[in-house]
Amino acid sequence: MVRKVNIIKGNEGQGKRIKFVQLIFVDINGMPKGMEVPITRLEEAIEEGIAFDGSSVPGFQGIEDSDLVFKADPSTYVEVPWDNVARVYGYIYKDGKPYEADPRGVLRRTLERLEKLGIKVYIGPEPEFYLFKKNGSWELEIPDVGGYFDILTLDKAKDIKREIAEYMPYFGLTPEVLHHEVGKAQHEIDFRHDEALKTADNIVSFKYIVKAVAEMHGLYATFMPKPIYGMPGNGMHLHISLWKDGENIFKGEEGLSETALYFIGGLLKHAKALAAVTNPTVNSYKRLVPGYEAPVYISWGYKNRSALIRVPAFWGNGARIEYRCPDPSANSYLAFAAILMAGLDGIKHKIEPFAYVEENVYEMDEKRREEIGIDMLPENLGEALDELERDKVVKEALGGAYRNFVGYKRKEWEEYLDYLEAKNLPKDTKNVTEWELERYFFI
């Protein structure tokens, strides 16, 4: 079976002796969890599954009923180039059936629903991250003072980015663009779009690679949405297109198709509820403030980076939409499922997109925004969860994970409010607290 898996992934003959394989899934937060087993158990992991206790996995089962089974997906098998270990993603089962709260399973079921309509989904993410020096405290130290697109001496992390890019193909990712971002020590490596499930896997793999390479160089990498007050946050813009019979159905004769516009309409309608899933942490809303190119206003436009939804200047089979509010703290499987069902609702009910803008939304006064019908995203996680609980479409998109997700996030929000009260801090503070750093720095 190991040889068969190697042939599937094109890894046969690398001369490495793989002794262990990591069985990887994600918890309700999108954090990778799993276990290592001897490589001799890989066939068992694929055919029968490996049992584990789900009671200590955030957002999974209670201690009274916690027996779960991991079944490996052999198409995801890769060998870690810097270690004699392999990795494989998979699905969670309970009592012989797919576990309803398994985030990867939630996305698979969403995609199966779209496949019945003949639709395939392609998504290209743009996850941003910071690199920090290790100093044993939360006084974050930056290793470079580069700025946006700086490529010469100011960007001291260029060798690290190149090393990350060199490792990415081993995990099935194709790097396309490496560049310094706006913030000091902030970076972005874009990789090629792929089918939605593969892209969700790729995001988990990308974070793993970035953190591992940073560690090799004595640095920390963080995908935390807003690690430092006053500096740009980490976003994860998503480029989305739908395909049918080998054709991009977002492609119109002049710009976007009617289908694409209805998809945008669905996203705009459900944007407030979606925020709970695409921006699922307390810290996410420290990023979503005016002045840092992070979208705050629910609007759309062509080439307009101040809008929530931007239509890039690519036509034909390159036609797509860019959803700009997500950040890397999102569980990519749940976020993709929610976004796709919101967009599908727009297509199904022919929801016309509203709040079209050509000007900079941040420079508009309140009266002008009201004239156009521009609303705002939630201002904090608590508000976002309120919106989610009122939105039937997004709730149903999360399937069996919904109750666990909301319960976990409500508790998270309440713990944050308790911290603010104990520290005598205002509820609406935009400062990044030590509570957030301790909770989110390693996401």
UniProtKB/Swiss-Prot annotation:
Cofactor(s) listed: Mg(2+)
Known EC number: 6.3.1.2
Binding site for ATP: E176, H239, I240, S241, R305, R310
Co-factor remark: Binds 2 Mg(2+) ions per subunit.
Catalytically driven reaction(s): L-glutamate + NH4(+) + ATP = L-glutamine + ADP + phosphate + H(+)
PROSITE patterns (UniProt xref): GLNA_1 (PS00180), GLNA_ATP (PS00181), GS_BETA_GRASP (PS51986), GS_CATALYTIC (PS51987)
GO cellular component, one term: cytoplasm
Molecular-function GO terms, alphabetical: ATP binding; glutamine synthetase activity; metal ion binding
The GS catalytic domain, residue ranges: 103-443
Record keywords: ATP-binding, Cytoplasm, Ligase, Magnesium, Metal-binding, Nucleotide-binding
Cited SMART domains: Gln-synt_C (SM01230)
Positions of Mg(2+) 2 binding: E128, E181, E188
Entry keyword annotation includes Metal-binding: yes
Subunit text: Oligomer of 12 subunits arranged in the form of two hexagons.
Function: Probably involved in nitrogen metabolism via ammonium assimilation. Catalyzes the ATP-dependent biosynthesis of glutamine from glutamate and ammonia.
Classification via PANTHER family: GAMMA-GLUTAMYLPUTRESCINE SYNTHETASE (PTHR43785), TYPE-1 GLUTAMINE SYNTHETASE 2 (PTHR43785:SF12)
Family as reported in the entry's similarity comment: Belongs to the glutamine synthetase family.
Name the UniProt record assigns to this protein: Glutamine synthetase
Organism this protein belongs to: Pyrococcus horikoshii (strain ATCC 700860 / DSM 12428 / JCM 9974 / NBRC 100139 / OT-3)
